[in-house]
Design a protein with these regions (language model features):
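Two-metal-ion RNase H-like nuclease active-site motif
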Residues: 207-211, 375-387
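Conserved RecA-like ASCE ATPase "motif II neighborhood" in helicase/translocase motors
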Residues: 192-254
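ATPase catalytic-site recognition across NTP-hydrolyzing enzymes
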Residues: 309-382
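Walker A/P-loop
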Residues: 116-137
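Conserved nucleotide-state-sensing and coupling region of NTP-binding domains
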Residues: 153-214
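N-terminal accessory segments
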Residues: 1-117
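ASCE P-loop NTPase helicase motor core
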Residues: 240-310
Length: 432
């Protein structure tokens, strides 16, 4: 007579309890969990398997641990990544050396797929693993449901091509990666020219489509899975141009976002360059428009240095970046008088919040002779300093029509007992 589900659950629990001292019983308990489709017990099984391994359980304990990861991999992103690279030397793996630091991002991505979030914004310093993590995430998503159409977009075709090749490397290299052990999906077709990957069958809208923001988006993808917007801005030169910022956002709002069907999820990742960049504009909309009051979204920003000036990315096995490394990078930016770029690229704080950088070629100059007549307006704009070597900056401005003339400036890194009298003197001198 067959056992009921309730009886099987009781036997499962009994075997796992015995499994604390008996590896064979733990293995039997896992097999029942697998037959029941019980993914709630996986962490407990793996912890016990590790205890047996520490006590000399050898290959049997290792194999049980691995089988448990493979079983839970389709349901759990963290387990998927651990199972995917299980056969690689740990120092060559992507995920395990970085797992502790990147787990908040992994958890947020898990929440997306579990239906707890609709939209996610990610920011972290260069070369800390954000794009590789997104490659693994999209492979997990494609394995879970190959019928979904997913879209990846970046500012240039070359970046999209690197992402496409990253997906294919893992899908094709069964010696290094155990993707085929976790998902029994097969590649149906690829297209390197159009950056398309189909799993299981060739579809009108591929399992993966890659496009640059300035490429052909209309008609290329009918995204009902995930849209990944990765580094939509090319760098500081673009950020310094209001026209280029607006052009990028117009492409996003008119060409990219309309490719998403209802229910599709969106992940934004990249440098928080400006309060007018694409990520900032989208966040502003979600924060301030009542039409999005029920939209579930989250921002995860992991800066290079924490509040104690220590590295957040000191990964194991020497694959990360030490506190000294980031402090040296900061010193280089400081030496070049470009701290705004440091804050944007490494701390996730837009340049305007830390002193916008202007290109000299974008400034207009005059010969010291002002237009005839009294100015329409005179004012002084003060950016005070709060210590730490920062400068008080206060240009004295005369306005004639739409033109602004800077006739003088207070710029000093002294304490307030030095700068306050300078400000008072400027106010009196120019009657502002």
């Amino acid at each position: 007579m067959a056992m009921t589900v309730e009886e099987q659950k009781k036997l499962e629990r009994s075997l796992i309890e015995r499994g604390k001292t008996d590896l064979a019983a733990l293995d039997d308990g896992f097999e029942i969990a697998r037959l029941l489709g019980d993914h709630e017990i996986g962490n407990e099984i793996r912890k016990l398997a590790m205890e047996h391994l520490r006590k000399g359980g050898g290959a049997d304990a290792t194999m049980l641990y691995h089988r448990s990861l493979i079983f839970d991999g389709p349901m759990n992103f963290d387990c998927f990544m651990r199972a995917l690279e299980f056969n690689r030397p740990v120092n060559e793996q992507f995920w395990l050396p970085r797992r502790k630091q990147l787990m908040p991002i992994s958890n947020a991505l898990q929440d997306m797929e579990d239906g707890k979030l609709d939209e996610l914004f990610l920011s972290q310093p260069p070369r800390t693993g954000k794009t590789t993590l997104m490659v693994m995430f999209l492979l997990w998503i494609m394995g879970r449901n190959s019928e979904r159409s997913n879209l990846y977009c970046s500012y240039t075709d070359s970046v999209v091509g690197v992402f496409y090749n990253g997906l294919l490397e893992i899908l094709n290299d069964s010696y290094t990666y155990a993707y085929g052990d976790i998902f029994q999906t097969k590649i149906a077709s690829t297209n390197a020219k159009d950056l398309l990957i189909n799993l299981e069958r060739k579809k009108r809208y591929a399992s993966f489509t890659g496009r640059s923001l300035y490429g052909t988006l209309n008609g290329a993808c009918d995204c009902n899975g995930y849209c990944i917007a990765d580094d939509l801005h090319s760098g500081i030169e673009e950020i310094l141009s209001a026209d280029r910022l607006k052009s990028a956002w117009d492409k996003v709002d008119n060409n990219l976002i309309p490719r998403l069907k209802m229910g599709a999820k969106m992940v934004w990742e990249g440098t928080r360059w400006s309060i007018a960049d694409c990520i900032a504009r989208r966040i502003d909309l979600l924060e301030n428009d009542q039409k999005y009051v029920d939209h579930r979204w989250k921002v995860v920003n992991v800066p290079a240095l924490d509040e104690n000036d220590e590295s957040n990315f000191n990964y194991s096995y020497g694959v990360g970046f030490s506190t000294e490394y980031f402090q040296q990078r900061r010193a280089s930016f400081e030496h070049n008088n470009d701290m705004s770029s440091w804050y944007a690229q490494y701390q996730g704080s837009p340049v305007e919040r830390n002193g916008m950088v202007f290109e000299p070629g974008g400034m207009r100059y005059y010969n010291g002779v002002l237009p005839d007549g009294e100015p329409d307006r005179k004012f002084i704009a003060v950016d005070p300093a709060y210590g730490g070597g920062d400068y008080t900056a206060a240009p004295v401005v005369y306005q004639y029509g739409d033109d602004l003339y800077i006739v003088d400036v207070v710029f000093d890194n002294g304490e307030k007992n030095v700068t306050q009298p300078q400000l008072v003197a400027a106010v009196k001198k120019y009657d502002v």
